[in-house]
């Protein structure tokens, strides 16, 4: 098989699993953590060409109040997928744009609802679903699965083959190394 056909086969069976690094909180993120994340953004921007961030999110004079709360964004992805399985990618991208480029807080349901509207979801249904027991159950199941996959961070790429899990090292500057790692997993004999 060629790299592109094998990678295409893998892509067809991809499954997103939300990782949920931080549970619900309305408390402001500690300043030390804000500084650490801002520095992480700078590091990423220096090492991955073309990456952009809007640092206004971390500006104390701005209207944003950073919180360490990723579960709302995870629920938003799940609620979008429940409403339309083909729109999961659009919700993920919308959340990333809101956070990284538009300095909007992805733990705010209003921000997540704006994204839902922008990608064509029924916003009223989305608002009901995001806080529903069904989505909460899905979130718990996904968090459990993320732990079982032994992901070392997020995002992660894990391939399941023959009941074995293979972590793929992410390389944002050279996709060929990831493609080759995927091919190597595909070609592993039982």
Residue spans for each PLM region:
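Thiol/selenol-based redox catalytic cores and closely related redox-interacting motifs
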Residues: 27-167
């Amino acid at each position: 098989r060629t790299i592109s056909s094998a990678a295409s086969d893998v892509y067809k069976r991809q499954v997103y699993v939300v990782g949920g690094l931080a549970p619900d909180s309305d408390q402001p993120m500690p300043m030390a953590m804000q500084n650490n994340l801002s520095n992480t953004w700078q590091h990423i921007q220096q090492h991955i060409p073309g990456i952009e961030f809007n640092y206004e999110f971390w500006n104390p004079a701005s209207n944003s109040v950073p919180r360490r709360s990723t579960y709302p964004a995870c629920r938003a992805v799940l609620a979008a997928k429940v409403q339309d399985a083909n729109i999961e990618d659009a919700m993920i991208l919308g959340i990333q744009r809101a956070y990284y480029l538009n300095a909007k807080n992805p733990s705010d349901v209003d921000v997540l609802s704006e994204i839902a509207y922008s990608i064509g979801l029924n916003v009223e249904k989305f608002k009901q679903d995001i806080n529903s027991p069904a989505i909460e159950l899905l979130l718990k199941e996904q968090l459990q699965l993320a732990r079982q996959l032994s992901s070392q961070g997020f995002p992660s790429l894990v391939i399941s083959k023959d009941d074995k899990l293979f972590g793929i090292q992410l390389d944002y500057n050279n996709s060929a190394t990831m493609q080759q790692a995927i091919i190597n997993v595909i070609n592993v004999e039982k």
